[in-house]
């Protein structure tokens, strides 16, 4: 006990961690808050599960058009608990989207987007777009028939945009047609660009909530 107390005192002297703890644990919670105000937190938990299970799958997944499908099959059939890791990843992805939708409805119906919380709402909308992008890019990674044709259709949508449409299609596909470059780009987006982007906007979102507090009743 003496040693643990000494360690605590050492950190307290340098970082004043007690003040941080008091700020976190003593934040005022309005009496109107109910279980529906937990939907955003549940979405965060789903993202953390996604991050953990996705990280685990990167040890076995091979982002090539010739090995992607076989590596996923290997994960599902030969790796210990691989089927469970991938299944949890898929289930938590669906749960994350559902919780996000419900969270958006709750915020909108209770007026949580109004002044002075406009920027909090904007960061939330950006995170919703990133979440959809997660779904689109992740759907293609097994590179089966469903994934391939989903990528071909989705990456071809920007072609309808005047002037820059063809450029955006080529940018997404990494060339004129869907192939290895497309899979590499979608894999990079799904495992690096989107997670870090979402983490940054989550941090901004939470800091604004901490600063402004929970919105009042409608």
Curated annotation (Swiss-Prot):
<dbReference type="InterPro" id="IPR016174">
    <property type="entry name" value="Di-haem_cyt_TM"/>
</dbReference>
<feature type="transmembrane region" description="Helical">
    <location>
        <begin position="189"/>
        <end position="209"/>
    </location>
</feature>
<dbReference type="GO" id="GO:0045158">
    <property type="term" value="F:electron transporter, transferring electrons within cytochrome b6/f complex of photosystem II activity"/>
</dbReference>
<dbReference type="InterPro" id="IPR005797">
    <property type="entry name" value="Cyt_b/b6_N"/>
</dbReference>
<feature type="transmembrane region" description="Helical">
    <location>
        <begin position="35"/>
        <end position="55"/>
    </location>
</feature>
<feature type="binding site" description="axial binding residue">
    <location>
        <position position="89"/>
    </location>
    <ligand>
        <name>heme b 2</name>
    </ligand>
</feature>
<protein>
    <recommendedName>
        <fullName>Cytochrome b6</fullName>
    </recommendedName>
</protein>
<dbReference type="GO" id="GO:0016491">
    <property type="term" value="F:oxidoreductase activity"/>
</dbReference>
<feature type="transmembrane region" description="Helical">
    <location>
        <begin position="119"/>
        <end position="139"/>
    </location>
</feature>
<dbReference type="GO" id="GO:0022904">
    <property type="term" value="P:respiratory electron transport chain"/>
</dbReference>
<keyword id="KW-0349">Heme</keyword>
<dbReference type="GO" id="GO:0015979">
    <property type="term" value="P:photosynthesis"/>
</dbReference>
<keyword id="KW-0793">Thylakoid</keyword>
<dbReference type="GO" id="GO:0031676">
    <property type="term" value="C:plasma membrane-derived thylakoid membrane"/>
</dbReference>
<comment type="subunit">
    <text>The 4 large subunits of the cytochrome b6-f complex are cytochrome b6, subunit IV (17 kDa polypeptide, PetD), cytochrome f and the Rieske protein, while the 4 small subunits are PetG, PetL, PetM and PetN. The complex functions as a dimer.</text>
</comment>
<comment type="function">
    <text>Component of the cytochrome b6-f complex, which mediates electron transfer between photosystem II (PSII) and photosystem I (PSI), cyclic electron flow around PSI, and state transitions.</text>
</comment>
<dbReference type="InterPro" id="IPR048259">
    <property type="entry name" value="Cytochrome_b_N_euk/bac"/>
</dbReference>
<keyword id="KW-0249">Electron transport</keyword>
<keyword id="KW-1133">Transmembrane helix</keyword>
<feature type="binding site" description="covalent">
    <location>
        <position position="38"/>
    </location>
    <ligand>
        <name>heme c</name>
    </ligand>
</feature>
<comment type="similarity">
    <text>Belongs to the cytochrome b family. PetB subfamily.</text>
</comment>
<feature type="binding site" description="axial binding residue">
    <location>
        <position position="205"/>
    </location>
    <ligand>
        <name>heme b 1</name>
    </ligand>
</feature>
<keyword id="KW-0813">Transport</keyword>
<feature type="binding site" description="axial binding residue">
    <location>
        <position position="190"/>
    </location>
    <ligand>
        <name>heme b 2</name>
    </ligand>
</feature>
<keyword id="KW-0408">Iron</keyword>
<feature type="transmembrane region" description="Helical">
    <location>
        <begin position="93"/>
        <end position="113"/>
    </location>
</feature>
<dbReference type="GO" id="GO:0046872">
    <property type="term" value="F:metal ion binding"/>
</dbReference>
<dbReference type="InterPro" id="IPR023530">
    <property type="entry name" value="Cyt_B6_PetB"/>
</dbReference>
<dbReference type="InterPro" id="IPR027387">
    <property type="entry name" value="Cytb/b6-like_sf"/>
</dbReference>
<keyword id="KW-0472">Membrane</keyword>
<keyword id="KW-0812">Transmembrane</keyword>
<keyword id="KW-0479">Metal-binding</keyword>
<keyword id="KW-0602">Photosynthesis</keyword>
<dbReference type="Pfam" id="PF00033">
    <property type="entry name" value="Cytochrome_B"/>
</dbReference>
<feature type="binding site" description="axial binding residue">
    <location>
        <position position="103"/>
    </location>
    <ligand>
        <name>heme b 1</name>
    </ligand>
</feature>
